[in-house]
A protein has these predicted regions:
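C-terminal effector modules of nucleic-acid-centric enzymes and ribosome-associated factors
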Residues: 16, 128-133, 142, 154, ...
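Residue-level signature of catalytic and energy-coupling elements of molecular machines
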Residues: 21, 27, 46, 66-68, ...
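Conserved Switch II/interswitch segment of TRAFAC-class P-loop GTPases
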Residues: 69-74, 84-106, 111, 115-135
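Conserved nucleotide-binding/hydrolysis micro-motifs of P-loop NTPases
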Residues: 72-73, 96-100, 115, 124-129, ...
């Protein structure tokens, strides 16, 4: 079967949602002719408590996967697991009862899981008169108006009489077609690896272990070797079913995999299958979190450190929601970037959606999308990290790649970027082409390897190389040079051999260093040159100290001191590294003492103004021109000494 033919088979998952006893299973039986209740207890109780799966043929000829999830409040976990991977939701609402608690809860879950297409099936119309049906439609319309499903079509139907079923199928076909292109796009990601959250695991006599789930990210084929997390069970795919035997399944399809390998019989719901080294698990991640509060209870804030159940894929782990440093508790309806700390590992990738339940009693309280699947243990974000999360939240891949590179201390490979951000290498390469052409990212080639670095990070690495060589020559004035390993270890202790070689090659191309034979050296390493630079540093600092906050621009400093360009450049580099001077503009620097004095003046002015002051007040306190004052104030903002509140009319306060 060709991939094009398989696409017409089922890359879209349709799932039901709705309150208990509103007729979801009966509706599916009317649509498909099959009863989704697969457990004896379900048939006896007349409700779905586990996950029912099947297929649905639409009028256009498309065959889509169908998921029926439980509506009872006690089975919220099963509902979340079943809703994971749904592309189009069928919200089932009884025309007799209208919107009920689990109706609301299920819609919230669908929003949190990123579902955007919905059809509302107004069921049991055979038990309601025209007025009741109209009231139910108004009730549904009013509820959905505050959600992403505000435009969802509402179709009255009766599973018992068959009235409206054909119309429902036609509308559902339209919704499936609306998300068809996106489903095709996920199939065509050539550099992705498959992931399968396991929602069922059972044994078939004569075949062995079978697991089912919704396939994510990439195709899987017979013969593929997979690994399960967190158990790390290694297995091989012996057979695949997608509404019948097939050699290959596509992402977005409901699949059953027949697995062979040691330990496969112990696999269970909650584990995730994937390609070893192409996916991982985490104990900490960053996410965009929407706090819903608890349905039907008095609204209350969410405190940092709240213990919760985190559900992603089909897994559930206990953890804590950590608000960022200095943030107030979350009010109901708020959306923020938060850190989630888990008590056990959770298989997760950036872009996945997670649902959060309160610890006890277990109730839906929120969820959202994962921004970064692995992060450091800190609630205080730097400006660079905030820029990274803003880019990831907006879906700006190039911005996210650039922001992540700006946070690294050394060059990295495209694979490093892809692993950190859970992107395909092709996506990273496309983003890097634009960043390199803009000049914000530099590419370093050594042999067959390509390394990448933020331009500012690379400049800092070159500064470190220059300072290291200067120090090594000063400590060993008789040495003509040093081994690359010794230089790299001193300049960049964390660099591996490949990164070190790339940085030294870059240093040679810039004239920062030179290499001859097995030695690396400063081409200007004569003792006299070193003394000249030291003396230049002393004279520059003395001049800047005397000038205070009204220091001349750096080219004028060089002219006044009669320093040649090379000496001036080397002196400024050394002074910046040892923090004797502080640049407030590209061509303006203050001595460390002057910058400290500026801080004192600004702090005093802000305190005198009652905790916040305008630029005009601060300029008067600094006693310099408006242009210089703005440069100094923006520098103090950048180093997090002050903070500018644009919404408050440009007032600055101390951090």
């Amino acid at each position: 079967m060709s991939e094009a033919e398989a696409l017409e088979e089922c890359p879209v998952i349709v799932g039901t949602a709705g309150h208990v006893d509103h007729g979801k299973s009966a509706l599916i039986e009317a649509l498909t002719g099959k009863n989704p209740d697969r457990l004896e207890v379900e048939r006896r109780r007349g409700m779905t408590v586990e996950l029912g799966f099947g297929e649905l043929a639409l009028p256009s000829g498309k065959i889509v996967g169908l998921v029926d999830v439980p509506g009872h409040a006690h089975y919220l976990r099963a509902m979340v697991q079943g809703a994971t991977g749904i592309d189009v939701a069928v919200l089932v609402v009884s025309a007799v009862e209208g919107v009920m608690p689990q109706t609301r809860e299920h819609v919230h879950v669908l929003e949190l899981l990123g579902v955007t297409h919905m059809v509302v099936a107004l069921t049991m119309c055979d038990l309601a008169d025209a007025e009741m049906i109209e009231l139910a439609e108004l009730d549904v319309d009013d509820f959905l108006s505050g959600t992403v499903f505000a435009e969802a079509p509402i179709v009255p139907a009766s599973s018992k009489t068959g009235e409206g079923i054909d119309g429902l199928l036609a509308v559902l076909d339209e919704q499936v077609s609306a998300c068809w292109d996106a489903c095709r796009d996920r199939v065509e990601r050539s550099d992705a690896a498959p992931r399968l959250p396991i929602d069922r695991c059972f044994t078939i006599k004569g075949a062995g272990t079978v697991v089912t789930g919704t396939l994510h990210d990439a195709p899987v084929a017979v013969g593929d070797e997979l690994m399960a997390l967190p158990s790390r069970t290694v297995c091989r795919v012996r057979g695949i079913q997608v509404h019948g035997d097939t050699p290959r399944a596509l992402p977005g399809q409901r699949v059953a995999l027949n697995l062979v390998g040691d330990g496969v019989s112990a696999l269970d719901r909650g584990e995730m299958l994937g390609v070893a080294d192409r996916f991982g698990q985490t104990l900490r991640f960053m996410m965009t979190f929407t706090y819903l509060g608890r349905e039907g209870t008095k609204p209350r804030v969410l405190e940092s450190g709240a213990r919760v159940h985190v559900m992603a894929g089909t897994a559930e782990v206990v953890g804590r929601i950590m608000l960022l440093e200095g943030e107030a508790p979350m009010a109901v309806g708020e959306t923020r970037t938060v850190q989630v700390r888990l008590e056990d590992p959770l298989p997760l990738c950036a872009g996945d959606h997670a649902v959060v339940l309160s610890y006890s009693p277990v109730m839906l309280i929120g969820g959202g999308r994962v921004l970064l699947s692995r992060c450091r243990r800190s609630r205080e974000l730097s400006a660079g990290e905030r820029a990274l999360f803003a880019a990831l939240e907006s879906g700006d891949t190039a911005g996210g790649v650039g922001a992540w590179l700006a946070l690294q201390m050394l060059p990295v490979t495209a694979v490093d970027v892809a692993d950190a951000l859970d992107l395909g290498v092709g996506e990273v390469d496309a983003a890097l082409r634009g960043l390199v052409s803009q000049g914000s990212v530099r590419k370093l080639a050594v042999g067959d390897a390509d390394y990448l670095a933020d331009a500012v990070v690379l400049d800092a690495a070159m500064d470190a190389l220059a300072a290291t060589l200067s120090a090594m020559h000063a400590a060993s004035p008789k040495e003509t040079g040093f081994t690359p390993g010794a230089v790299a270890h001193a300049a960049w202790p964390a660099a591996d051999d490949g990164v070190a070689a790339a940085l030294i090659a870059e240093g040679c191309s810039r004239g920062v260093c030179a290499a001859e034979g097995a030695e690396v050296f400063d081409p200007h390493s004569a003792a006299a040159a070193a003394r000249v630079v030291r003396e230049a540093c002393e004279r520059i600092v003395a001049l800047l100290d005397e000038a205070g906050l009204d220091a001349p621009i750096l080219p004028e400093v060089g002219e006044q001191l009669q320093l040649d360009r090379d000496t001036m450049t080397r002196a400024l580099r050394e002074l910046s590294l040892n923090r004797s001077i502080v640049k407030v503009e590209c061509d303006v620097a203050l001595s460390a003492a002057a910058e400290a004095h500026a801080r004192e003046l600004v702090a005093a002015a802000i305190e005198a103004a009652g905790g916040a002051a305008t630029t005009s007040v601060l300029r008067e306190a600094l006693g310099v021109s408006r242009k210089r004052a703005i440069s100094i104030l923006e520098h103090l903002d950048a180093v997090r000494f002050t903070v500018l509140d644009k919404e408050a009319g440009g007032l600055r306060s101390l951090r």
